[in-house]
Amino acid sequence: MKQAVIVDCIRTPMGRSKAGVFRNVRAETLSAELMKGLLLRNPQLDPNLIEDVIWGCVQQTLEQGFNIARNASLLAGIPKTAGAVTVNRLCGSSMDAIHQAARAIMTGMGDTFIIGGVEHMGHVPMSHGVDFHPGLANNVAKASGMMGLTAEMLGKLHGITREQQDAFAVRSHQRAYAATIEGRFAKEIYGIEGHDANGALIKVLQDEVIRPETTMESLAALRPVFDPVNGTVTAGTSSALSDGASAMLIMEESKARALSLPIRARIRSMAVAGCDAAIMGYGPVPATQKALARAGITVADLDVIELNEAFAAQSLPCVKDLGLADVVDDKINLNGGAIALGHPLGCSGARISTTLINLMEDKDATLGLATMCIGLGQGIATVFERV
């Protein structure tokens, strides 16, 4: 079977969704700039070789509608001979884009793909136009469509305290801020034009969402937002609302070597799994177990892990049940996560994978895992191997 490899991976800075640096920048522009960036960074690649552009996006309406993958690829000047498709696996959309490209390569259906994802949550809110079928109530509780309440449920089932959640959130901001000031995000962030608070055009080179001032005391002052009476999940222990995009150049290994392109990682295994929608945040556990089995490894073999922080209350049960509680500070989300950086839905899968690959290089690691939960009860996971 042919091997799928990551040649390059980049992301935009993460902008605040409320009056942030990308308030005047459209989702198609964020996407197109990354597509152009991949080609500029890899001049050996003839753009005419691109088979397909596979782009994750959840709210496919307004500026994100009518196949944003194609709109952005045309904006980027990618040859019209390349295909383009927008995919939606909710939070796992751009990781699913990775999987789609990898499967195509492994089965001989193309050897050069640009993949990624975007979500401009400031322009297209997560709940915009959502209308669940009334018949779903026969199988799924109404609260299962409210992600914060599913996090409350998962936290209660696993005995996760408010203090544990607050500590996890503080860690996320501290780690992300340290990664910023120490330049550890510099390799993955591709600067994008935006606007400062006064409306002046600027080149955005750092994440806007991180709050380094976050402390246990400041989080303790926040009220539960989803279950105000009995809940423990606050805005501070939930992923921030942010705008951003991520992108990868994925190729068949021998093709990349023939063009003298760098091979940053190989896709070792992939998996998706379902779980009860009421505890959607538990999805990374069965998805990871599948991916590890397919790779022929155990969780102990993993050197670095990126677990998307949708909520602290869902991340901590996954850490516990995957047997990772003792290695959090050594292996998991070493540069912070979505609580600090935000979770632009269609962007996050390729974003955490990009961060993972850079961490693997920094630590000279061999095996890494990127995994995330998905609304309405799914999980997705990818094992990467440096070669």
UniProtKB/Swiss-Prot annotation:
Its main location: cytoplasm. Signal peptide: none annotated. Its EC number is 2.3.1.16. It is an enzyme of class 2 (transferase). Keywords: Acyltransferase, Cytoplasm, Fatty acid metabolism, Lipid degradation, Lipid metabolism, Transferase. One of its GO terms (cellular component) is cytoplasm. It comes from the Bacteria. It catalyses: an acyl-CoA + acetyl-CoA = a 3-oxoacyl-CoA + CoA. Pathway: Lipid metabolism; fatty acid beta-oxidation. GO terms for biological process: fatty acid beta-oxidation; phenylacetate catabolic process. The keyword Acyltransferase applies. One of its GO terms (molecular function) is acetyl-CoA C-acyltransferase activity. It is found in: Cytoplasm. InterPro entries: FadA, Thiolase, Thiolase-like, Thiolase-like_sf_Thiolase, Thiolase_acyl_enz_int_AS, Thiolase_AS, Thiolase_C, Thiolase_CS. Heterotetramer of two alpha chains (FadB) and two beta chains (FadA). Belongs to the thiolase-like superfamily. Thiolase family. Catalyzes the final step of fatty acid oxidation in which acetyl-CoA is released and the CoA ester of a fatty acid two carbons shorter is formed. This is 3-ketoacyl-CoA thiolase. The lineage of its organism: Bacteria, Pseudomonadati, Pseudomonadota, Gammaproteobacteria, Alteromonadales. The gene is fadA.
